[in-house]
Amino acid sequence: MFFTPGRGSRSPTNAVITPRFELNSSGSISPPLVVSGLGVRADGPTQAPSLPLTTGANNPNPNPKARDNPSESAATPTPPRPVVLVEMGAPTYRLAAAVTGPSGAEAGFLVARQPPPPRVQEEEGEYGRFVDSDLYDLPSAPLRRLAQGEQARPGVAVADAEAEGPLDLSRLDVPAALDQILSQLGLTNAMCGEWRLLKHIEEPEFGPDAGVNTVLVITSLESKPEALQDSCKWMSTEGARELLSDVKPGDTRIGPYVHVGFVKSDLSSDCTAGSTLVSQEYPPGITLVPMKSSTLRPFRTTNLVVIQATSGTCGSKRPDYFACGDVLLIDPGCCSQVHTELADLVNSLPKKLLVLVTHHHNDHVEGLSVVQRCNPDAVLLTHENTMKRIGKGNWSTGYTAVTGGESICIGDQELQVVFAPGHTDGHMGLLHVNTNALIVGDHCVGHGSAILDNRAGGNMKDYFQTTYKFLEMSPHVLIPMHGRINLWPKHMLCGYLKNRKAREASILQSIENGAQTLFDIVSKTYCDVDRKLWIPASFNVRLHVDHLNSQHKLPKDFSLEMFSGSCDEFMSSLQQ
């Protein structure tokens, strides 16, 4: 679930849940040889929606352009680690509404088509064919916190609005938010019965901001309206369940509010029940548990992904399945401070356990030893290039090598391993076939773009090819290991391509204008970027120069030997 298990009632009419945000220290954790995902605070109108608060395009969320400029969301995973501080602050709120037929949910509920992120003119060319399918979800609107002494205007009342506790609806402008929601549906409040508080959904600490908590309310119409807005339609619980759990590329998609409001309790259990961890399940069968890790600011956590059967356990192994289990863990990379919590989680899981590591960076493997200690029979799956870089202290026994294309069975869940080089030469992704959700490791991050590890086979040509491969797979959801999931995957991936191509063009221009050394290129290409970010930016610059050379685009008077020699001098030049 999105809220903290064991911290408040789960009953439909009592949703007083204690918000928990464990703030990490403001210092940057910097293992000197670890590269991981980073996003820098993004401010701008073109930001791709993410879960759980933002399924529409007009909400604050990660920037799909993923520019290297901090003002446009530059992502930088890598050593050494510059400090980019983003204050957590207090969570904001959003109101989502479940509007059912006159006889309740049995008569169906209303969903609204979510507006996609705005497309710019250049997307109609090369990227015009990559369009995300329609996404329907419960209607929602921002829920403003009232100022001190301010009273909400008279109007719509919600049962339990005066409830004592951390969630006090009397301090939130519920009437204004409900007005926005009803206008999306083409309804008026006079057509609705009593509004009741259904759930308070607490967003886990994905970062870099404090997140958005959601208040879910429910009402029944007095009678079904004769006409609805064109963007709205009736949905049954059974229909939503089918669209969520038996997905084909290009199908109509169902968003997270429908899942948590009407479907989730019927499909699966919470793997973090009874613990202090806050998790999020969406799509069905995929649970994200952000856990404190040694990743680079502004992120503080790495998403541990837990995939469990939604019904039954693993049966006999089919010939076409490479591996079978009752549960799959992906990237247990939490730091030692939360190894006790990781151990508790692993001990609560079925013993037929598979573990997949997308790549070798410390913030993705630091918890492997805990998993092995708790379950010595667990099977580790990873690429051979990754295993060569994982220390014996993390995993002391054998492993099963994967190269891409392997099928994995987790009870009633099917997954396909995807070879996804670029970030490193052994980087892997994973497609959750049931929901068409793509787990992308550090190829993408929930906020910003990715830096490639040039010391571990990172390669710009591979990165471009993997991005196009992901686009052709037509995923419905992107799940990164840092930050929130992205509900507009094609839009996000196209943004990554545009960003990298634009950056490569600017690097080539600086070389054509006389830049010869790494410092020359970085200082010209990133002149409007904080110098603290030049170090991580330099890793991608090296790989862009290699990519330009492989395409025979570098000027004849550009000396690769001089450029390579200047890479060792970059740090001293930066400090001058």
Segments (PLM) and residue ranges:
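A short coil-to-beta-strand element that immediately follows conserved catalytic motifs
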Residues: 188-200
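Active-site HxH/HxHxD metal-binding segment of metal-dependent hydrolases
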Residues: 300, 334-411
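C-terminal regulatory/interaction regions
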Residues: 509-576
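Metallo-beta-lactamase
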Residues: 136-139, 322-329, 334-336, 414-509
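Conserved beta-strand hairpin/beta-sheet module of binuclear metal-dependent hydrolase folds
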Residues: 271-348, 429-441
